[in-house]
């Protein structure tokens, strides 16, 4: 039976079962843990030279089904791709143009899916960014609260500080900073769905005198240095390589002298920012984050410094994000019946692959998560930061 498959597939030894449209099935190794159901004959040819993008696209379009644990399916599919995919198939990075209209459309595409859909698998505060696990067995809710606190501690946030939250999402960090640190917060987003629910939660907690959430593009931020601290969490991935300098200049102009800026976001493995993961990056660009671009740590750090800010602290949270994504993926998999009632089948397929696939990508080191803390020095070059980092952990 195995002889009916193309030679490239016959020679593989993977814990994978191929089940064909005609009922035939083939085990590519002992004790298969994952089954790929190929529903169309022409897909067999693609499987002899597959990329993660091709496999993902076939699943999203319903031409291929995955049976078994979704995380294990991602791993086995990557092993299949690794065995048959060549370096020549990799494409050079494509630089994207970004303007207010296209960025707003991209944000709406990703974040305006359904508040109820996000609530199924996010934590209670709906923090859609990397959590911070002080202990590996902490719950997602606890880890997200600890992330908020970790950011506020790094920013040395004090009572009465005016904090700018760029890409505030549903306002979880803004409300935490106001509630726990007595800060005044101005949060901006481009998502109308996020803004609506975020404002409802601000009102429900009685924080309307401290938290102001608005629709505003970062390019339109006031440049009079009115903010004591600036935080940007999971937002700069949407900025694009071409606009990194402008983005950092806007943060510089928004914060006062002596103030602090925190940039928390996903970074690329390669210095030139090219996609990794044998087509995984292309899948995300096509279906999940249109126009998204991940810069390397060196690229965003250089842009921060060129804008006039001084980088004073950098921390990698790569494995924290892998664990966060595992929580999200598991939560979604446990709520598939509810999710199917909230979003179209194609959307649900995209998100199942995206969450499990990103968890795998962070584990493999294809992408990273860095928190970069910077200060805007006074005119004479000094600043007020402590001589050590010890205060952040007291």
From Swiss-Prot:
Name the residues annotated as catalytic in the UniProt entry.
358
Q: What is this protein called?
A: Probable fatty acid methyltransferase
Q: Which domain of life is it from?
A: Bacteria
Question: Any idea which UniProt keywords this protein has?
Answer: Lipid biosynthesis, Lipid metabolism, Methyltransferase, S-adenosyl-L-methionine, Transferase
Q: Where S-adenosyl-L-methionine is bound, by residue?
A: 128-129, 163-171, 189-194
Tell me if Transferase is a UniProt keyword of this record: yes
According to the UniProt record, which cysteines are disulfide-bonded?
A: none
Q: Which CDD domains match?
A: AdoMet_MTases (cd02440)
What GO molecular function terms would the record report?
methyltransferase activity
InterPro entries membership: CFA/CMAS, CfaB-like, CMAS, DUF7884, SAM-dependent_MTases_sf
Give GO BP annotations, semicolon-separated. Answer: lipid biosynthetic process; methylation
Cell membrane among keywords: no
Family, as annotated = Belongs to the CFA/CMAS family.
Q: What is its EC number?
A: 2.1.1.-
């Amino acid at each position: 039976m195995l002889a009916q498959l193309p030679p490239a597939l016959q020679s593989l030894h993977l814990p994978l079962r191929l089940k064909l449209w005609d009922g035939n099935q083939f085990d590519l190794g002992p004790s298969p843990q994952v089954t790929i159901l190929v529903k169309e004959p022409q897909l067999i040819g693609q499987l002899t030279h597959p990329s993660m993008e091709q496999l993902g696209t076939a699943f999203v379009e319903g031409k291929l089904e995955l049976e078994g644990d979704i995380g294990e399916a991602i791993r086995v599919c990557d092993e299949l791709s690794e065995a048959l995919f060549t370096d020549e198939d990799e494409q050079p990075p494509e630089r994207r143009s970004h303007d207010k209209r296209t960025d707003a459309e991209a944000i709406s595409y990703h974040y305006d899916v359904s508040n109820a859909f996000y609530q199924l698998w996010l934590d209670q505060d709906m923090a859609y960014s990397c959590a911070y696990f002080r202990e590996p067995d902490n719950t997602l809710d606890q880890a997200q609260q600890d992330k908020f606190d970790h950011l506020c501690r790094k920013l040395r946030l004090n009572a009465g500080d005016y904090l700018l939250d760029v890409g505030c999402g549903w306002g979880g960090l803004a409300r935490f900073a106001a509630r726990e640190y007595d800060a005044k917060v101005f949060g901006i987003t481009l998502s109308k769905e996020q803004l609506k629910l975020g404002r409802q939660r601000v009102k429900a907690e009685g924080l309307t005198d401290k938290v102001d959430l608005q629709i505003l593009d970062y390019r339109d931020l006031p440049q009079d240095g009115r903010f004591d601290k600036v935080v940007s969490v999971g937002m700069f991935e949407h900025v694009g390589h071409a606009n990194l300098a402008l983005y950092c200049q806007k943060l510089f102009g928004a914060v006062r002298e002596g103030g602090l800026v925190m940039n928390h976001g996903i970074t690329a493995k390669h210095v030139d920012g090219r996609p990794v993961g044998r087509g995984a990056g292309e899948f995300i660009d096509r279906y999940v984050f249109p126009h998204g671009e991940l810069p390397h740590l060196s690229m965003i750090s250089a842009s921060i410094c060129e804008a006039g800010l001084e980088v004073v602290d950098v921390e990698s949270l790569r494995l924290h994000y892998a664990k966060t994504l595992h929580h999200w993926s598991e939560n979604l998999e446990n709520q598939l019946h509810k999710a199917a009632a909230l979003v179209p089948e194609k959307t649900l397929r995209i998100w199942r692959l995206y969450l499990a696939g990103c968890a795998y990508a962070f584990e493999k080191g294809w992408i990273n998560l860095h928190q970069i803390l910077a200060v805007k020095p006074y005119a004479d070059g000094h600043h007020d930061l402590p001589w050590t980092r010890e205060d952040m952990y007291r």
